Amino acid sequence: KKIETFANDQGHLSPWVTWPTIHRGINNEKHTIGFFGQNLEEIDNEFPPLWNILRASNIDVGMFGSLHSYPLPKELNNFKFYVPDTFANGPECFPKNISYFQDFNLKMVDVSNRNVQSKLPIKEALKFSMNFYKLGISNKTIFDITSQIFKEKAIKERVVRRRSLQAQISFDIFYKNLLTFKPTYSTFFTNHVASAQHRYWLAKYPNDYKNILYDDSWIEKYNHEIDYAMQTADKF
């Protein structure tokens, strides 16, 4: 059976474009969002995202990580919690204490950029770790953080699994706030599965390609990364 994907967006397919289309119900010719760091004030006023529409309709909302959700809205009434995406220009969150996580999170994104690096922003990591329990980080996640550090030392390519760990940490915080505030509408967004698919599809499905620019050792190292990312999401 042939499956066809249809989208009204013009130009190349990009999550930075497609998600605003979904959130706002109009295509990119109208919302004109195509990259991070755009000033969205006028766009948000004319074509507000779903979470702002619900808030304005007196429906309480919990929003975590949706793309193009920075900065914090000027009006926070009816938002139970609000955590902008991992590409935000600043760490501001609501409630304010989540900013300890977001500050660390954004620094990690800056350090790793396209390829995950083994560096750690020490100052932000310490502040974040001192607030683990207040933020809702589970004992299992704390164990997994510790385990990840040791695994990276033994097998250096395991550093790429930090993306999945970041999503796991994020979900702990989301879930804590979900249980605490019980919003009528809530969303949680993670990009770690898509990121693994973009980078390691060839390692998982080498037979899909006629010309392979990577050697067998690279494929062997990374052929389980998509599965690992998806299994992490399944455990949320």
Spell out what each predicted region is.
Residues 1-18, 60-64:
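Short, structured active-site-proximal loop/turn typified by the sulfatase FGly-forming signature C/S-X-P-X-R
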Residues 42-45, 227-231:
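A short beta-strand-to-alpha-helix junction
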Residues 219-229:
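Membrane-interface transmembrane-helix boundary segments in multi-pass integral membrane proteins
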Residues 1, 228-236:
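Metal-dependent active-site segment of extracytoplasmic phospho-/sulfohydrolases and closely related
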Residues 13-18, 45, 49, 169, ...:
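Generic alpha-helix structural propensity
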Residues 25-219:
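His/Asp/Glu-rich, glycine-adjacent segments
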